[in-house]
Structure formats: C-alpha cells, structure tokens
Swiss-Prot record:
Source species taxonomy: Eukaryota, Discoba, Euglenozoa, Kinetoplastea, Metakinetoplastina
Assembly behavior: P1 and P2 exist as dimers at the large ribosomal subunit.
GO biological process: cytoplasmic translational elongation
Molecular function, one GO term: structural constituent of ribosome
Organism: Trypanosoma brucei brucei
Protein name (record): Large ribosomal subunit protein P2
Role according to the record: Plays an important role in the elongation step of protein synthesis.
Post-translational modification comment from the UniProt entry: Phosphorylated.
Keyword Ribonucleoprotein attributed: yes
Similarity annotation: Belongs to the eukaryotic ribosomal protein P1/P2 family.
Amino acid sequence: MKYLAAYALISLSGKTPSKADVEAVLKAAGVPVDSSRVEELLSEVEGKDFDALCAEGKAKLVGGVTAGGAAPSGGAAAHAAAASAPAAAAAEAEEEDDDDMGFGLFD
C-alpha cells in the first residue's frame, strides 16, 4: 500500500512516476524500500492513466461489497459478549479519569 501511496502522490503532482521517484518519496518518508516491489507496481500500472486506475479501484470496491453476501453470524453468545465489552471499557475509562483529578502533572 505504501508503494501505491507514493505512486499516487507523484501522479497527483502532475509527473509520470518513475522507479527513482517512487523510491525517493518512500525514502523521504523513512520507509525501507524494496526495489523489486517498486518495479512490480510500475509494471502493473504501465500505460494506465492514474484517474482510470482510481476509477477501476472504486468499481472493484463497490462490486466486492454487493457481491459478498451476508457474513456468517456467531450466534447470541457473541452478540452478548460484544455488548458487554463497551460497558466494561467505559467503566475502566471512568476509573482512569478519576486518577487525573489531582492535577499533579509531574508527581
């Protein structure tokens, strides 16, 4: 995903991304670069317009959501456990808030 993000950033700047450009963006962000993955990305998108790639990706996302069908249910026990988890988290958060009422920043 980071390789695609670098490609998108360069494309949106108006340039045609090259291997050196993508690697430079990734290195500037402090990301370790695998040159073979950059080459693979560039070969996959070669000759394609960035806007067309975005439209193609959107179509796949929308199509995947409607074609997937319903997810299997875990039953009533899973729903009960999921419902009790937020209540426990809220109670724990309230306990943590009480500790900060002394305003002792560097105690």
